[in-house]
């Protein structure tokens, strides 16, 4: 029985090798379309409506800060989770009402979280409506002059 198994797997190895070689060859052809480090970013199609984020004018400051703490930790992409959660842990407690509103607009007014990441890391230019004091503070935080390891979110 073992001999039959060995023979049957040896017989199947050749087609598998051919499949792998053809896939590797097809992947090599794709390098001519993009350059290493290039950001492939497409505009959203017009048929995808982006829901408006609800404005909460009567929300108490402490409630808003708690909501922003939660939203900064649960972005849906690890890169922003780490950047924003460490930023909020360091600065949010000292934000005024105006600064808190700016931060709320920054993380909830943008339809694509990758935009926040690219702006914070200076990969793409920040649009004027989001180029605020809070964004400049976030950019400085991302530069990590203190060389702090940010491999996990801070404790609550």
From Swiss-Prot:
The keyword Chaperone applies. Keywords: Chaperone, Mitochondrion, Transit peptide. Its main location: mitochondrion. Residues 1-24 form a transit peptide. It is found in: Mitochondrion matrix. The keyword Membrane does not apply. GO terms for cellular component: mitochondrial matrix; mitochondrion. InterPro entries: SDH, SDH_sf, SDHAF2. One of its GO terms (biological process) is mitochondrial respiratory chain complex II assembly. Belongs to the SDHAF2 family. Plays an essential role in the assembly of succinate dehydrogenase (SDH), an enzyme complex (also referred to as respiratory complex II) that is a component of both the tricarboxylic acid (TCA) cycle and the mitochondrial electron transport chain, and which couples the oxidation of succinate to fumarate with the reduction of ubiquinone (coenzyme Q) to ubiquinol. Required for flavinylation (covalent attachment of FAD) of the flavoprotein subunit of the SDH catalytic dimer. Interacts with the flavoprotein subunit within the SDH catalytic dimer. PANTHER family: PROTEIN EMI5 HOMOLOG, MITOCHONDRIAL, SUCCINATE DEHYDROGENASE ASSEMBLY FACTOR 2, MITOCHONDRIAL. HAMAP family: SDHAF2. This is Succinate dehydrogenase assembly factor 2-B, mitochondrial.
């Amino acid at each position: 029985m073992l001999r039959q198994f060995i023979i049957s797997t040896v017989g199947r190895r050749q087609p598998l090798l051919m499949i792998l070689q053809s896939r590797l060859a097809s992947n090599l052809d794709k390098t001519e379309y993009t350059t290493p480090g290039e950001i492939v970013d497409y505009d959203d199609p017009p048929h995808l409506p982006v829901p408006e984020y609800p404005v909460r004018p009567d929300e108490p400051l402490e409630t808003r800060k708690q909501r922003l703490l939660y939203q900064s930790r649960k972005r849906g992409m690890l890169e922003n989770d780490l950047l924003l959660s460490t930023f909020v842990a360091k600065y949010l407690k000292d934000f005024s009402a105006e600064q808190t509103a700016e931060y709320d607009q920054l993380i909830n007014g943008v339809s694509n979280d990758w935009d926040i990441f690219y702006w914070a890391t200076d990969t793409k230019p920040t649009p004027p409506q989001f180029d605020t004091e809070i964004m400049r503070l976030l950019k400085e935080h991302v530069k990590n002059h203190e060389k702090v390891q940010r491999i996990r979110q801070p404790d609550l």
